[in-house]
Amino acid sequence: MDKADFLKGLPVYNKTNFSRFHADSVCKASNRRPSVYLPTREYPSEQIIVTEKTNILLRYLHQQWDKKNAAKKREQEQAEGEGGSPAPPRKIARTDSQEMNEDS
């Protein structure tokens, strides 16, 4: 099949785009050797590389938030220690579950 016959039925806006096509000018395989990574350090073969599942942006924002709030946490802990009585625990034991166990 000739190139002209192959390209004949294709819809085009400008036919001169295909008139300059030459198969010889298409990328030729070069004789250059491909670049290869050569490690500078020797790593153990049993080393396992694990990728983080969280997004880089989310991880960065969490780190910034932790840095920002670390000072606030320290201030609260110091204030509680100086005040004498520690704050009550945030979680309170459920009393209804004990009552349910007594009924059965």
Curated annotation (Swiss-Prot):
GO cellular component terms, semicolon-separated: Cul4-RING E3 ubiquitin ligase complex
Pathway(s) where this gene product acts: Protein modification; protein ubiquitination
Q: Where is this region: Disordered?
A: 67-104
Keywords, in A-Z order: Ubl conjugation pathway
* Short name of one Pfam family: DDA1
Superkingdom? Eukaryota
Please name the InterPro entries in this protein's record: DDA1-like, DDA1_dom
Q: Which GO terms describe its biological process?
A: positive regulation of proteasomal ubiquitin-dependent protein catabolic process; protein polyubiquitination
Where in the sequence does UniProt note compositional bias of the Basic and acidic residues kind? Answer: 67-77
Q: How does it assemble?
A: Component of numerous DCX (DDB1-CUL4-X-box) E3 ubiquitin-protein ligase complexes which consist of a core of DDB1, cullin-4 (CUL4A or CUL4B), DDA1 and RBX1.
The entry's family comment says: Belongs to the DDA1 family.
Known role: Functions as a component of numerous distinct DCX (DDB1-CUL4-X-box) E3 ubiquitin-protein ligase complexes which mediate the ubiquitination and subsequent proteasomal degradation of target proteins. In the DCX complexes, acts as a scaffolding subunit required to stabilize the complex.
**Protein name from the UniProt record:** DET1- and DDB1-associated protein 1
Q: Which organism is it from?
A: Danio rerio
